[in-house]
């Protein structure tokens, strides 16, 4: 089933100049990038983005990290995009991520694990709407 998912390349990916290498993996897998932009999250937007983690012990560190530099946000489209992209990025903790996954190959620590991808259709819809207007998303 063709679907869209949200992907964010976190500040550490941008700082370490990994943008092209990561995007190339999605394109090599046959996915289309149908929307993409560079942003810098402010605290208010970061809190909206991570509202489900509010109150957790790692929340402040996560917010501080996500507002520390530029990010790339994008909408990736293709067959079973949500589940396939999640497999491609690997486990949240880079130490547990398989070699060959994006985190397994490039990430160093948590939350500095270079990438985020939506984990469900509902999350994808919420995150895409949070970062993109409809006219910023293109069909082929």
Swiss-Prot record:
Q: What is its main location?
A: cytoplasm
Gene Ontology CC entries for this record:
cytoplasm
Protein source organism: Methanocaldococcus jannaschii (strain ATCC 43067 / DSM 2661 / JAL-1 / JCM 10045 / NBRC 100440) (Methanococcus jannaschii)
Q: How does it assemble?
A: Homohexamer.
Q: What is the name of the protein in this document?
A: Nucleoside diphosphate kinase
In terms of superkingdom, the source organism counts as Archaea
EC?
Answer: 2.7.4.6
Q: Does the keyword Magnesium apply?
A: yes
Annotated active site residues, numbered on this chain, are: 116 (pros-phosphohistidine intermediate)
Which gene is this protein's source?
ndk
Write down a Pfam family by its short name.
Answer: NDK
């Amino acid at each position: 089933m063709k679907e869209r998912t949200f992907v964010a390349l976190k500040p550490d990916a941008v700082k370490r100049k990994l943008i092209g290498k990561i995007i190339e993996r999605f394109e090599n897998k046959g996915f289309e990038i149908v929307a993409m932009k560079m942003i810098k999250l402010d605290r208010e937007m970061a809190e909206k983005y991570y509202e489900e983690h509010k109150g957790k012990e790692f929340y402040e560190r996560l917010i501080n990290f996500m507002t520390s530099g530029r990010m790339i946000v994008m909408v990736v489209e293709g067959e079973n995009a949500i589940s396939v992209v999640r497999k491609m990025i690997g486990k949240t903790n880079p130490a547990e991520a398989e070699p060959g996954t994006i985190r397994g190959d490039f990430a160093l620590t948590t939350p500095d694990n270079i990438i985020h991808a939506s984990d469900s259709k509902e999350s994808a819809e919420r995150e895409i709407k949070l970062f993109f207007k409809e006219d910023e998303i293109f069909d082929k």
